[in-house]
Amino acid sequence: SNQGIIVIGDVDVDHTEAMIKKLFGGIKNPANQAPVLDEPVPDTAEPIVIIDKDKEQRTNNVQVMFKHDTYPDSLKNSVEYILYGYLKGAALNMLNDRYTEAAQKADCPYVGAGASDDNYIFAKTKDAFSIFAQPKDPSQLAASLTAAVVEARRAVEFGFTPTEYDRYKADLLSSLDKAYSNKDKRKNTQFFNECLGYFLTNEPMPSIDYTYQLMKQMVPAIPIEAVNEYMKQLIPKNDSNIVIVNFNNENEGAVYPTRQELLAALQTAKQQQVTAYVDNVKNEPLITKKPTPGTIKSEKKNDKLGYTELKLSNGATVVLKHTDLKKDEVLLSAEGFGGSSLYGEKDYLNAKMFDEVIANSGLGQFSLT
């Protein structure tokens, strides 16, 4: 009992069904099988604090979880549940964008932080809004916890800005358009995960056509006030149902946070005065002055492999190939011979970190976020 078989792929349905019945049809449940119970996770009046260390734990990090009730499985097959998922996705996406932006600041105590809202650890009967932070230095762990919770409180107290919400909706609708235009090229793993969610927790699995039409109507109609109201529900005003988990790299001579320090960091975050977030939107072109265009020196077609090779006046070689694998997708990559091997030994570390630094540095006058 309580087992399922999911088959996804280009298979002979009748033959596959017959084989499943042949292989599994004779399995019987034991006479006195143990009942399957979903153990309830109790509410807690006082915070739970867990501190641990291990030599194989490479980084020090801290996480605070605010437990709350799950969405009932019996009510998931509804438009209301899809709306709930949209509000949650919008709030978490915009909050995580703020964490990414904050981490770029020199005085930010964490190198990275994020928020999620899902199962409380592995429990099916309790969910949790979780905030995670990894400090720049182990000595800043408590400060990282404070800063990460303060950022969430900023969203709770002042909400998100219209410009943030406009960007989120534009990105979501763009993703929907792309998924819909490539609906006949979905991967088997996508279908499998939808079936698995439906079997385990009654997650709805509407068709891509239904989802597309519903979201195209829903997204423009939901005001930012609805998202902000959802955000307000995530952090409780008291200390009930709070869990703090801190994992540390075990190292000789290291000093680890105490229960009192972590609780004090959380209380500081809950009591600290916060100001509204300012979305510094830049309405200017990425390139203010267009470069002088070059010329195409030569063009050569390869009919056998279906590509065209161009030689440009700046010495670059461009290879163009048209495919119909995915609609509305253009993939571009560039490389130059030599790379870091052209630099001396003293620039080894600089060359090694170059790609990561550039990826986190934004473009032109625009920051990463």
Give the ranges of each region predicted by the language model.
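His/Glu-rich zincin catalytic helix
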Residues: 1-107, 145-146, 247-369
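M16 family metallopeptidases and their MPP-like homologs
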Residues: 1-8, 58-79, 99-224, 240-248, ...
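Glycine-rich, charged/polar anion/phosphate-binding loops
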Residues: 45-51, 114-118, 227-228
